[in-house]
Swiss-Prot record:
Domain CTLH span(s) in chain numbering: 41-93
Lineage of producing organism: Eukaryota, Metazoa, Ecdysozoa, Nematoda, Chromadorea
A biological process term (GO) from this entry: embryo development ending in birth or egg hatching
Segments traversing the membrane: none
Name assigned to this protein: Smu-1 suppressor of mec-8 and unc-52 protein
Protein family per UniProt: Belongs to the WD repeat SMU1 family.
Location of region: Required and sufficient for interaction with smu-2: 1-181
Keyword set includes Membrane: no
Organism of this sequence: Caenorhabditis elegans
Start and end residues of each LisH domain: 7-39
UniProt subcellular location: Nucleus
SMART domains: CTLH (SM00668), LisH (SM00667), WD40 (SM00320)
């Protein structure tokens, strides 16, 4: 990843803003003096201008004390303040401002005549507004001062230093560099770096989650930040689990109150947003809902996302769109803001089984039980290429881009005993096979976070573990005696979830 250069002056300004918001004004003044870097920010430019045009000079002068402004503009400001004080017959205050403020001391040095006229105005026993203001009214002068000073200041979002620190911690959590739910010693950086775990295939079951006798998980996924394991079940419930103990997350208020997220039909697919804050779910009745995981609130619903069941959902990189594929053979893009279908991509002749955005977000990849993979232009929706893998038109079940592969490659899982590593043009680079003919056809495939291992679950209830680089089958692991449905991989640990029609969601570790 290319390095990002940060100006030292910007870092100083972040500290200065923190000092200002913490009312550490003396420290702020010393830092500005020693570094010669000024903050020059106000909470609101409109508010700053309103203070000037309203003549709230106490607030104005307090604000400009922490700003670095051109001497001429400061002299004009202080001169006008003195004039208004004289008009109000606040003569003692006017003398104090004229004799003890830096802008007026500077004025006395560089323009003695102008300063003398100001002193004369203070000493007069009367105030003649017509003589002082002339054809330019007091209000007009205030407006001019407001306009000239506003061009020197900026508005910055509050608490930028704390916000950036929070964002950096969130990024480290997303990358697996911080353990979820752990208190962080920010200064000492005790948890700032976590040893990278060597990717290894699982060898044993850690725990299992049992569903009700009339239900079973149709889908499951870990959140990118590793905080959640979410399942979607045959009866429409969407549940958030603590994968460390296999219990329902009761720290989520809505689950503690038995007010679960729910759809009207079986939840066929689930996908998290990149920041792990939102969850998209698709059901067999053609509906999609988007949830806020922390609260369980439904943020957006697409009641007619597809005319038949929804088989796959994905968030766009910026969370502004939902990509979906359905049993109606159509790939669609839905707008989060509008709640409407923005784009349709037709061409598949059977069920859509998986949809993906390419890593850069410019392309959409879809696969279908018609045995084809299509690459679409992300903006126009035009089909750029169509290809198939293998010698037979086996139904393709899912495609997974291989992380950091150059040139880009992906793993294709179809209803056979072989996985295919292909490039974006569909050329087969490598194959991985179970070698089993009877009940050896794969149903679902996942990749480890770094792309070193591919795990495929077959009709026989066995998980096959392949090393991607060599394509060799390293080990097998029986995971269910009933019909398996799918797999999900933890984003940072050697932890895999398997789910099947036996009503068990099992967690496997090394």
């Amino acid at each position: 990843m290319s390095s990002i250069e940060i100006e030292s002056s910007d870092v100083i300004r972040l500290i200065e803003q923190f000092l200002k918001e913490s009312n550490l004004h003396r420290t702020l003044a010393i830092l500005q003096e020693e570094t010669n870097v000024s903050l020059n920010t106000v909470d609101s430019i409109d508010g700053f201008c309103n203070e000037i045009t309203s003549g709230n000079w106490d607030n104005v002068l307090k604000t400009v004390q922490s700003l670095k402004l051109p001497a001429k503009k400061l002299i004009d400001l202080y001169e006008h303040v003195i004039i208004e004080l004289v008009e109000l017959r606040e003569l003692a205050t006017a003398r104090l401002v004229a004799r003890q403020t830096d802008p007026m001391i500077l004025l006395k040095q560089i323009d003695p005549d102008r300063f003398a006229r100001l002193e004369s105005l203070i000493n007069r026993p009367y105030f003649d507004g017509q003589e002082v203001y002339g054809d330019v009214s007091k209000e007009k002068r205030r407006s001019v001062i407001a306009q000239t000073l506003s061009s020197e200041v900026h508005v910055v979002a509050p608490s930028r230093l704390l916000s950036l620190l929070g964002q950096s911690l969130k990024w480290q959590l997303h990358q697996g560099l911080l353990p979820p739910g752990t208190a962080i010693d920010l200064f000492r950086g005790k948890a700032a770096q976590k040893e990278q775990i060597e990717e290894r295939y699982p060898t044993m079951m850690a725990r299992s989650i049992k569903f009700s006798t009339k239900s079973y998980p149709e889908s499951a996924v870990f959140s990118p930040d590793a905080n959640y394991l979410v399942s979607g079940s045959k009866d429409g419930f969407i549940e958030v689990w603590n994968y460390m103990n296999g219990k329902l997350r009761k720290d989520l208020k809505y689950q503690a109150q038995d007010n679960l997220m729910m759809m009207d039909a079986a939840v066929r697919c689930i996908s998290f947003s990149r920041d792990s804050e939102m969850l998209a779910t698709g059901s067999i009745d053609g509906k999609i809902k988007v949830w806020k995981v922390e609260t369980g609130d439904c943020l957006r619903r697409f009641d007619r996302a597809h005319t038949k069941g929804v088989c796959a959902v994905r968030f766009s990189k910026d969370n502004s769109h939902i990509l979906s594929g359905g049993n109606d053979h159509v790939v669609r893009v839905h707008g989060m803001k509008s709640g409407k279908c923005l784009k349709e991509m037709r061409g598949h002749s059977s069920y859509i089984t998986d949809v993906r955005y390419s890593d850069e977000g410019n392309h959409i990849i879809s696969c279908s039980t018609d045995g084809s993979i299509r690459v679409w232009h992300g903006k126009s929706g035009e089909c750029l290429s169509t290809f198939r893998v293998g010698s037979e038109d086996y139904p393709i079940l899912n495609v997974i881009p291989i992380p950091k592969s150059d040139p880009p490659q992906m793993i294709v899982c179809n209803r056979s005993n072989t996985l295919y590593v292909v490039n974006i043009s569909g050329q087969v680079v490598r194959t991985m096979t179970s070698g089993k003919r009877e009940k050896g056809d794969f149903i679902n495939c996942i990749l480890s976070p770094k792309g070193e291992w591919a795990y495929a679950i077959a009709e026989d209830g066995v998980m096959y573990c392949f090393m991607v680089l060599s394509g060799t089958l390293e080990t097998t692991l029986p995971v269910t005696e009933r019909l398996p449905i799918g797999l999900a991989h933890h984003p940072h640990q050697n932890l895999i979830a398997s789910y099947a029609e036996d009503g068990l969601l099992k967690l496997w570790t090394d």
